[in-house]
Structures are given as C-alpha cells and as structure tokens.
Amino acid sequence: MTPAERRAFERQLQQEFPGLELHAWYRQYRSLKAAHPDAILLYRLGDFYETFDDDAKLVADLLEVTLTYKEFASQKGRDQKQRCPMAGIPYHAVEGYVARLVGAGYRVAIAEQITETPSSRTDTRPRSIFAAGIEQTSLTGSNRMVERKVVRVITPGTIIESGMIPAERNNYLAALIADHGRIGLAYADLSTGEFAAVEFSGERAAQQAQGELTRLNAAEILVPDRADLRLPGLEPSSARLEQDLEFLTREERELLLPGERVARRVERENNARWAHGRVTAWPERRWDLRNAHDTLLHQFGVRSLAGFGLEDRPLAIRAAGAIVQYARETQQGVVANLRSIRAYTPGDAMFLDPQTQRNLELLEGASGTTRGSLIGVLDQTRTPMGARLLRRWVSQPLCDLTRLHARHDAVERFVTDAILRASVRETLRRVGDMERVVNRIIQGVGVATPRDMARLRDALRALPELVAALGDWTPPPGEIDLTGVRTLPPSAATDPVSLTENGNERIEPNQTSAVSLRAQREARRRVSARYADEDLFGEEEQNAPPVGSSNHAVGTQPSADDEASPVTAFVDDQATETLALDPCADMLAFLETAIDDEPPALLGASNYLRAGENGEPPRRVIRPGFEPEIDQVVAASRDAQRWISELEPKERERTGIKSLRVDYNRVFGYYIEVPKTYADQVPKHYIRKQTLTTGERYFTDELKRYEEIVEQAQQRLIDLERRAFARICDVVTGAGARLLRTARMIATIDVFAALAEAAVRGRYVRPELYDDTRLRIVGGRHPVVEQTLDETFVPNDIEMDTETRQICLITGPNMSGKSTVLRQVALIALMAQIGSFVPADAAEIGLVDRIFTRIGAQDDIATGRSTFMVEMTETAALLAQSTRRSLIILDEVGRGTSTYDGMAIAQAVIEYIHNEPRLGCRTLFATHYHELTDLERTLPRLKNYHMAATEQDGRVVFLHELRPGGADRSYGIHVAELAGIPQSVIRRASELLAELERRAPRSAPPTVPARGDDRRSAGRASSSGAGAARGEQGRTLPDGQLSLFDLAPGPVIEMLRRIDINQLTPLEALNKLHELQKLARAGGG
C-alpha cells in the first residue's frame, strides 16, 4: 500500500471497530483482503488456510467445513474479547478445495508466509502446492509478526495446477474488446502455453466472435469494465431492450416476418454474473493500445510484432495485451510459458455458429458429457495433449485442400499398417501429458513440482521406442503447432511487473539466463572446501550465485572454457523447424542423473536422513550423486547421529556410571542424564543443563556441536533441495523449445493414430475432397447413432450439387429418421474436413466453408424470446451469412406458428435459397408440410425425398430408408402410441382421423405456385392470385387429410356462427336447418 492508502485503510478500521484494539494478525489479514476484495482470501496459519468474516461463512457453506470463531480484538481498558467467524482448510488438501471454489465461480487469493520464525526453522512439514517455491526470509529486529503476502490469485481462466483442470480439455482465458464495429479476441491456455488472437470486422463481426467463443468454451472471458459488446450472454448488467432485433442486421430483419418483435423485458441487475461468473470486467486502462503493444514486446522479447502478424490488428493486440497483464497480476509475477502468439483469420477454418456446434453435438451430447457426441466416438487418443488437439480439430475443420489431403494420407498410413498403429498407440500410453508438464516446469519452482520432473523423465523414456516404431514416417508439414516453440529471452520471462503512476505497466528488465556450468562447478568446489572445514551448516557465502542466475549476460553464449557436459546441450537452445521426432536423449540422461526414482509430491517432503532405515523406502527429489552438498549434509548428519547413538555406552564405560543415559526432548535437545547418587563421579567437562529431583542433566561442547548438525540438517537439506531443483528447472527451461515441439508432435501423431483407430473400428472410408460443390455419399451412416443402436444401422445415399440437385426436400413420418439423415450428412462433411475418414461406403465432398443448422428450438426465457422467435432469428442469420459453398441443414422450419404462417415461411425460405444468386448452396430441408413437395415442379434444382415406412399386420414399420419422391402419410397416431399415450386417447384420435379423411373432398386445388429463377414478376402475380383463391375455398392435403384451418368463411358458415341455439324453439330450428340446406345446395358454402 502507498502511505495514502495505508492512512485510508487505518481510518476505515477505526470507523469499523471503534474502541477496539485489533490483533496484529487481523490487521494483516484485513490489509491483504482490502487489496483483493473480490476474492476469497485463504490466509495461511499453521496447518490450515483460514478464512474469516464473510469469507468464512461462504466457505463453510460451500465446502461443508466447520464454522468456528477466533479472537481478533479486545476492548480497550476491559477484559472483553471480540471474535470473528473462521473456517479453515487443511494445507495438504487445499488443491481440491480451491478447485471447488473456483468451479463455483469464485476468485481465490492465496496468502502465504514469506518470513520465518526461529521455531518455523525447525518445522520440516512440506509446504502446500502454492507455496513450494517461496524463498522465506528470517524475521529481523523487533518485528515478531510473520509477514505474509498474496502469492497467487486463482481464477477460472488462470488455473495451471494439473489436478484442478480436466486433462482432455483446454482451460482457456479469453479477452474480448469491441470498437467501431470491429472486435478483437485473444485467448490463452496458461497450462499449455497456447496463445492466439484474431480480429473480426464487418456486419458479421458479432456473429463470428460469438461462434469463436462457443468453440473455445473459455473458462473465463475478460472484457473492458465499461464494455457494451452486444453479444448474447456478455451484457455487463441488464438485458438490452429488444435485444434480438438490435443484434440483427438490416438484411436479417427483412427476412423476418413483419411485425415480429421481442418482448420488452429488462433483467434485474446481475452483478454476481460479473463477480463470480465466467465474465470478468477488467479496468479499461489495461486495454490501452500502447500499453498492450509494449506489454507484448516485453513478454516475447522482441522489438516488433510484425513477425506475429499482429501489426495491423490493433484490437487483437489490445485483447492479447490484456491477457498477459491479467495473467501476470493473478500469477503475482511473470508468465514464462507465453512465449509467442499465433494470429489467425476467420476464414482459416470452416465457420460453425453456436447453434450448429450444439445441434450437431460435436463436443457434448444431450447429457452434457462426451457421451453421445462426435468427439466421444472419434477420441481414441492415448495422451491428454492428443485429446485436446483432437477437440480443436473437431471444432475447427479446415478449408485448405492441400492440408486435408495430407491429413488423410497420414490417417491412411495408420489405417493400412495395423502393426504401426498398435505399437505407436501402446507406446503413447506411457507419454502422459508432456505438454502441460513442460509448461509447468518452464514457469519455475513456484509452479513445478518434483512429480512434474518425474513425469517428464518417464515420458522421455518412452520416446526411443516411439521413434523406432515410426521409422522414417513424420507428420505432415504445417500440422505441428509451433506457437511458443521458440526460446524466450530470459529477460522477458523474468521481468518484474510494476505500475506507473497512471496505472500502466512498467517492466524493468532483470538480466538472467540459463544455468552456468562454470558457476555450478565453482559452487561445488566451494562446497567441498567447506566440508573439509566442517562448515556445512553455516551461512551462505556472499559470492555464491543466486538460484536461477549465471555468469552469462542475456544473449551471450557460455565461454569456451566451459567444459562439455550433458547440460550444455540445453543452454540457449533454439528451436528449429524439423519434422523428425526429437527423442531429447540428452535431456533424458540429465533427468536420470538429477531426479530420484520416486520423488515426493512436494519440495521439502524428502526423507534423505531416514531412507533405508527400518525398511523405509527412499523418497527423495534429488538423486544421490547429483548435488554433492546434499550428499555431504546427509553424510554429516548420519555421522552425527551415529556418534550420538554411540555416546551412551562410551560414557558409561569411561565414567563408570552404569545408569548414565543419553536422551532427547524438544525443549532441551540432547542431554546426558546422571542420577544424584553418582553426582561425585560426573566429569569436569560436563556442563549442567537442568536439575531434576532424581538427578542432573548435562551436555558437552562436543555433544552440542553434533546436536546442531542433526537439528540443522533437515532444514539445510530443504534449502539445498529447493536450490538444486531451481537449477534443474532452469536447465529444462533452456530446452523448453525442443521439449514443447516434441510434445506437440507427439500430440499430432496421437490424433492421427486415434482417427485411424476410429476408422478401423467404425469401418470408415477415406473421403475424396474436391474444390467444387458436389456432395455424394454412398451408404452414409450417422457415426454416433450407429454405435448406440442394438440393431443394424440402415445406411443411406445422397447426391447433391449446386447445378442440378441443390435442395433435397425430405418428408416422412415422425421417428422415421429424417433428423438422423440431416445430421449424418453434416457430420460426414465435417469429419472429412478435420482429416478423418467417414462412415460411408464412398464419399465425394466439395469443400464446405460453413455449416448452418436449424434443428429444434426452445423458449429463451432469459431474453424474452419465444420458440418461434428463436427459430426465426437463427433462420435469418443463416440466410444472411451463407455462401455458395455452405451446407444448410433445416429441420421443420415454421412449425412454431400457425399452419399457414409456418408453411408460407417454409416455402419462402426454400425459394430464397434456390433463387438468391448469392446463395444457391447445398441444402437439406426436412418438413411435415407435404404440400411443399409440389415445389419440385417449379424449382428445377429441388428434389423430393422421403423416409420410407410400411404397414404390416396393422402396425407401422419404419424402414429408415431415404427414397426419391414425397411422403403420403405422417403416422402421427402410431408415434403417439409408441410414446405411451393412453389407449382411450389413441382410439379417439383414430376415430377423428377416419372421420376427417371421410369428409375430405376427393380433389384438391394446386399449392401456391413457387417463384422460379426466370419468373420473378410472374411469381408475384401468381402468388397474389393464389392468396385470393385460398380465401375462397378450403384445401385438401395431398395425402387426403382435411386441413382444419383452411375453411374460408361463407354464407353457411356465417349463418351457423350467428345462430343462438339456446334461444331456438324446435320449429325455428327446423326452419333454420331448411335454410342452411338450400344455401348449401345453391353452392353458398
């Protein structure tokens, strides 16, 4: 705090607690809480992370822990104590509890102890996962209050702990900013180092940004605190008035029915959504272009962003800069693994809007899990990083024909070589999540754990076998994501961050580099000399190099007299683009010598002094022989313990006191106890320590020296272990570029092998891709449905193009499989463009740039949108955004309103897709409006299809076959019976249907003529004429069913409506009936 902030804070405490003397620890707690008022503060006290006041009540309720009370103040001049609510979390289980808090949408600040008391010096308990890398300092002077500070602020998008995020999914932090019709979007996964940015412009910017956010499914989204992004779900306080119409462009509004409006509805203020939801308001000054530009330059250690493709994308720069600053602030320091950024354009991949991603169930099924989704079928990966990469491929299909052919070649290699596929997949089981492990190590001791090093070593152990299995095969060029696979200038990775007076970040370079071998050797030489002088447990020498430093300046190379060793291969390593899988054999050799076989989970938990005693297995971080000083401290401590254990028999023999004993307690340490009866035989060099009723306790100078060696050994080993581990982290960081490149190449290999495995299991075929608009599928199957059926899946053929078969109009009964056919065509096209084989006997597919689906709908209560409004909004969007290369899937458009309105909209939509020169795209349209089948006569590129069904013994049998021509019946009553409708209802419905069909006229007028390509003006005339005709008489459906809603009002109908039956006498009723009969016979309808 600044002095002014400190004074304001003290005034606040005085006003809040008048007349109370606050305990020092509570003042410290409130000071830390004031700096992080929007976070739950976990305050380390002994074995627990404690929460107080309102935080304690919240934590006790959410985590179901005990709520207690603790004294925090006393009344001045009185013996009256004040208590506050308190709830604690055990330090050894903090990771799981924090994950639950963050999962509930809360920010969590971790306050750790950064100074130590004399008593804590002997505390050998391992620290928590959040405190392992903190270098504590000793209390000095009269200050006896342990200092604490917030070392991490954990938010949904900044989690890097492997146990707190799903292994198979990315944990994205996204940033979104809009300005003058343009939108900048950046996202990063701090656990993998992935960092990318894009900028959207034009009328479709909002829709494109929303689609990308849906694809990312970001854990947390940063927006400027005064943003008005106008994106659904990202409103800062209340819902917008007539929100849906404001999101639509003029063209989209013209496609909607006139007069349709969104209800004026205002949500109440929803601050919780910002404070605890996935949207986080970030101060607007953090989005300043100059500030963001400088932040990225320092982060990447470069002088220009041109090489990243960002120079002409100011909003992308601002979004990316906000992510780096937010990450630095929450991590309370640097974010070393964000080494580079990838700029991309919206057209690089197939566009999938949020509705399409949801309707096709690409990543989640109806249950909210991968069960029943496409990824649930295709994900046969063996590594978490492969699973994450496959998810990205599924949500970002390619539009690059060359890359797709290369992907299909790679999958085919694994399909045709079963031995290669099996051996590679078996080996991949042992690799684990190498990508996240390397990224954690790169971030240093504060993040990396000994188990991370062991996991990296175990992964590297599997690579020689993987390289041998692959032989000379390598992944296709361009498929390895090299974002961040470059050596980061150390200054960029370790710059401390501070704020200037105006709030902008100022970065002060701090020159560090990889570990100097000469410095290590010199340190070990000094250690040997000190051991000879028996000074292992003294203070560090003033000239000893600090952890993580070296004798090399930034950008320089080790001097020529640095001897070669396994470590030299990693210093100042530069990533080079090579397609061969690098097994990193030198790194494996280094880690084999540095890290013990079974290290503990955390630093400080090693059992160097107890390993091997009483059968206790070794549990050490540093392997014996790697760090001489650790070995020497262990040897010295064991020698001292041995000397102490042998002291008692020696002294008994030397003094003749048979009851003399050597013992230990925590208060007095080691002592020699002599009974009073032998007081005259005590040697003169014994020094009295304590007088007892039964005797005296003594010590000697020699015992005191060995006692100090034993007592200081454990803490000394903890310090040495932490420093050695930091040097190992530096070495791995120096090779980080190579390791990350290897990890990402393994992920790519894993994906190709997984797609091949899915192809073999599902009997998929390689699709043929073309740079045109054909779509021919022979024996196509739904990849998900066919795996869930107990019976054999019925395949279907479909053939389309934009010249002769542009629109397939599909009719048929309910439950006959119309929706399945629609979805399987879309999924086959999508699978082909991620590089997968497809479930079919053959497939020829012209590249699809966008897939739009309009399948199903439900009310959007939060924004006041009816089912029909949702349906029309989505339909308008796809009509406005589609191109000639798009694929449109429409299911039951128009069913959310009256029959005539719905059918009119459905026909108009079909005509628009068929006739609009900008469109003309491949379209599958399923409907129950059988009248629309007449459109085949007037729209030359529309073809009718139906789902076949037959009747056997009075029962309907769905054949699930797609056949040419329109359907003649819907079999709705049969479906109702299958759904469990009571039999009385079924019988009554059957009676009504038979009556309606009996009363239906035998002939029916033609449907409304469609607008063809060459009859736009004539179409308008015929359309208006049809409307007049429709007003004159009812209409019979093609399948013989009578429409209940087509009857136009005539004289008979009007007379019937005006009759008041209750006022008629029998004679008057008979006369009225006679009049009605005359009118009917005269044709008065």
Swiss-Prot record:
Q: Does the keyword Calcium apply?
A: no
According to its record, what are the GO cellular component terms? cytosol
Single GO term (MF): damaged DNA binding
GO BP term, pick one: mismatch repair
Keywords attached to this Swiss-Prot or TrEMBL record, sorted alphabetically, are: ATP-binding, DNA damage, DNA repair, DNA-binding, Nucleotide-binding
Q: Superkingdom of this entry's organism?
A: Bacteria
The keyword Endoplasmic reticulum belongs to this UniProt entry's keyword annotation: no
Q: What are the Polar residues biased-composition ranges?
A: 548-559
Q: Which InterPro entries match?
A: DNA_mismatch_repair_MutS, DNA_mismatch_repair_MutS-lik_N, DNA_mismatch_repair_MutS/MSH, DNA_mismatch_repair_MutS_C, DNA_mismatch_repair_MutS_clamp, DNA_mismatch_repair_MutS_core, DNA_mismatch_repair_MutS_N, DNA_mismatch_repair_MutS_sf
Return the Low complexity bias intervals.
1019-1031
Q: One Pfam family, short name please?
A: MutS_I
Name the positions where ATP binds: 812-819
Q: Where is this region: Disordered?
A: 533-564, 997-1042
Assigned protein family: Belongs to the DNA mismatch repair MutS family.
| Stated role | This protein is involved in the repair of mismatches in DNA. It is possible that it carries out the mismatch recognition step. This protein has a weak ATPase activity.
What's this protein's name?
DNA mismatch repair protein MutS
